[in-house]
């Protein structure tokens, strides 16, 4: 079976192992077609060059996409010293080349230390960020450069896995909005050798460290029942939120848009995972003053 014509709602999260050479949106559309999903969205683009985890949200799961967009990510990347490109990766044109450079293992380690923690990063012109509604990469292809402001990012892990004097392999865990190819380029600049990224693989999105990814080929070869079994429950993406169990009457009230009294001890403004008495996921609520809760994003069914 290759595709399905779904007569029912498809709700859940698929952890897709995106192939190289495909845009995130193209991967989303192929997966959406395979599942026959009426509504779908991805949670953080991967460049065509990149592979790895691309969480896709189907149906009611699209209501929690923002939490996955905001989640930390972990990557494995390979950089090459000695040259820079206009895109900071191997798909671009070489704009700088240096033949005579020497970088020791100790120098590389010392340089990586400078990029750990909270740092500033200037996004590449070859990014999906927009200027007056136009993606920067489109402007870059027209030879237009726009001034970009440095942004705060956090590199929580930066580990050197391999280094042969030219190519270096890194494991990087970072906050949202981090451009790994820019990080690789900045490392090369600090070493005064230049560098560009040759490989990028997303290992996981926070919350899914131990979950399996599936390729499009694997999914296409599966029967429908097995394919649907690959979907992850919506609430697994928000396990970092405090869970709150509501009574049947409270579930009814909050679905009607009413504020309910539920002494959770949560901080005002804190998002909460809401469940019914039978542990069915209701959606996301928000804590108010005095422990009250209001609906923030409810699913339209009980899982």
Curated annotation (Swiss-Prot):
<feature type="active site" description="Nucleophile">
    <location>
        <position position="47"/>
    </location>
</feature>
<dbReference type="InterPro" id="IPR015240">
    <property type="entry name" value="tRNA_sdUridine_synth_fam1_C"/>
</dbReference>
<dbReference type="InterPro" id="IPR036974">
    <property type="entry name" value="PUA_sf"/>
</dbReference>
<dbReference type="GO" id="GO:0031119">
    <property type="term" value="P:tRNA pseudouridine synthesis"/>
</dbReference>
<dbReference type="Pfam" id="PF01509">
    <property type="entry name" value="TruB_N"/>
</dbReference>
<protein>
    <recommendedName>
        <fullName>tRNA pseudouridine synthase B</fullName>
        <ecNumber>5.4.99.25</ecNumber>
    </recommendedName>
</protein>
<dbReference type="GO" id="GO:0003723">
    <property type="term" value="F:RNA binding"/>
</dbReference>
<keyword id="KW-0413">Isomerase</keyword>
<comment type="similarity">
    <text>Belongs to the pseudouridine synthase TruB family. Type 1 subfamily.</text>
</comment>
<keyword id="KW-0819">tRNA processing</keyword>
<dbReference type="InterPro" id="IPR014780">
    <property type="entry name" value="tRNA_psdUridine_synth_TruB"/>
</dbReference>
<dbReference type="GO" id="GO:1990481">
    <property type="term" value="P:mRNA pseudouridine synthesis"/>
</dbReference>
<comment type="function">
    <text>Responsible for synthesis of pseudouridine from uracil-55 in the psi GC loop of transfer RNAs.</text>
</comment>
<dbReference type="InterPro" id="IPR020103">
    <property type="entry name" value="PsdUridine_synth_cat_dom_sf"/>
</dbReference>
<dbReference type="Pfam" id="PF16198">
    <property type="entry name" value="TruB_C_2"/>
</dbReference>
<dbReference type="InterPro" id="IPR002501">
    <property type="entry name" value="PsdUridine_synth_N"/>
</dbReference>
<dbReference type="InterPro" id="IPR015947">
    <property type="entry name" value="PUA-like_sf"/>
</dbReference>
<dbReference type="Pfam" id="PF09157">
    <property type="entry name" value="TruB-C_2"/>
</dbReference>
<dbReference type="GO" id="GO:0160148">
    <property type="term" value="F:tRNA pseudouridine(55) synthase activity"/>
</dbReference>
<dbReference type="InterPro" id="IPR032819">
    <property type="entry name" value="TruB_C"/>
</dbReference>
């Amino acid at each position: 079976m290759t595709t399905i014509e779904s007569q029912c709602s498809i709700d859940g999260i698929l952890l897709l192992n995106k192939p190289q050479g495909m845009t995130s949106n193209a991967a989303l559309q192929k997966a959406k077609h395979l599942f026959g999903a009426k509504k779908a969205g991805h949670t953080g683009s991967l460049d065509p060059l990149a592979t790895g985890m691309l969480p896709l949200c189907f149906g009611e799961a699209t209501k929690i996409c923002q939490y996955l967009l905001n989640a930390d990510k972990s990557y494995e990347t390979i950089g090459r010293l000695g040259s820079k490109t206009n895109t900071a990766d191997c798909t671009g044109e070489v704009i700088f080349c240096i033949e005579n450079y020497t970088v020791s293992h100790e120098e590389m380690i010392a340089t990586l230390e400078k990029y750990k923690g909270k740092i500033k990063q200037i996004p590449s012109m070859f990014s999906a960020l927009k200027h007056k509604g136009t993606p920067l990469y489109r402007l870059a292809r027209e030879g237009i450069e726009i001034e970009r402001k440095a942004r705060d990012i956090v590199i929580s892990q930066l580990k050197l896995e391999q280094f042969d004097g030219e190519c270096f392999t890194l494991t990087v865990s970072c906050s949202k909005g981090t451009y790994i190819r820019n990080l690789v380029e900045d490392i090369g600049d600090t070493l005064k050798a230049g560098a560009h990224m040759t490989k990028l693989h997303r290992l996981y999105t926070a919350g899914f460290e131990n979950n399996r990814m599936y390729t499009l080929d694997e999914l296409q070869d599966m029967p429908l029942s097995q394919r649907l079994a690959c979907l992850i429950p919506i609430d697994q993406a928000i396990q970092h939120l405090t869970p709150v169990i509501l009574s049947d009457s409270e579930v009814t009230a909050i679905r009607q848009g009413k504020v309910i009294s539920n002494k959770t001890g949560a901080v005002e403004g804190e998002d909460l995972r809401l469940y019914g008495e039978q542990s069915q996921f209701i959606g996301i609520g928000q804590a108010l003053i005095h422990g009250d809760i209001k609906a923030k994003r409810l699913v339209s069914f009980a899982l």
